[in-house]
């Protein structure tokens, strides 16, 4: 049944360029790799600047070279993984609200690639995004030393708006081993029900005038962790979108040192023509940066 729906989806959308959306705050792995660029030459990805993105590309490229696919075709397969940053999608059918179905049949593996690990499938091979590299580049969340949770507005940038729809947001559990790919058993649900489509508040990584804002409360993690977001369309085809973003917590005392954060805040406020609100006291500026939770001025980790 799911295979039939995927085939129908492909037939309907084949003539057009498909585009849907991606995590902009925090920033999806595949979007960071796309924004870095330099993945078209040479074929083997040697010019890709970021180590994890380069490794992800090479994992797909050499996978198909090992199957005797010629270099250009293997490169196109790996490039597609970055090019289609807005379409990390899977089709569930009318039972999209059956979470066991999602976990067991729709995206049973390769979670950060939306279950896509075959170049001949509708959504291609995005398995490089799921590789458990230790050098995925995280977004940094700054919090007070005694702050046990972090409140923020997650942004999902729609390149095509789909309504009705809903979101589910997860993070990896505190005992997750980064040396292994993410599985559903290693994810903890933290929210998504209060999502809203709002005017873009200044998210520089989203070109759309509208953005989905999803308020969540993130429990503290002592090590680098992953946020996993599902954006599910409510329709008979049941197309959903699945993105991974890497995160790490830093305490203000250890990382910010007030003056550093004040400089960042002043720079961002000036950029958005809000100079009148700037307080040049370093401690106060740093405190305001933490209180804002970077919902508008989030450090994208580029």
Swiss-Prot record:
InterPro entries on file: Cellulose/chitin-bd_N, GlcNAc_Chitin_IntDeg, Ig_E-set
Organism field: Autographa californica nuclear polyhedrosis virus (AcMNPV)
Protein name: Spheroidin-like protein
Reported function: Component of the virus occlusion bodies, which are large proteinaceous structures (polyhedra), that protect the virus from the outside environment for extended periods until they are ingested by insect larvae.
Keywords recorded for this protein, A-Z: Disulfide bond, Glycoprotein, Host membrane, Late protein, Membrane, Signal, Viral occlusion body
Subunit structure, interactors included: Homodimer; disulfide-linked.
Keyword Signal in annotation: yes
UniProt gene name: SLP
Positions bearing carbohydrate: 193, 293
Lineage, uppermost ranks: Viruses, Viruses incertae sedis, Naldaviricetes, Lefavirales, Baculoviridae
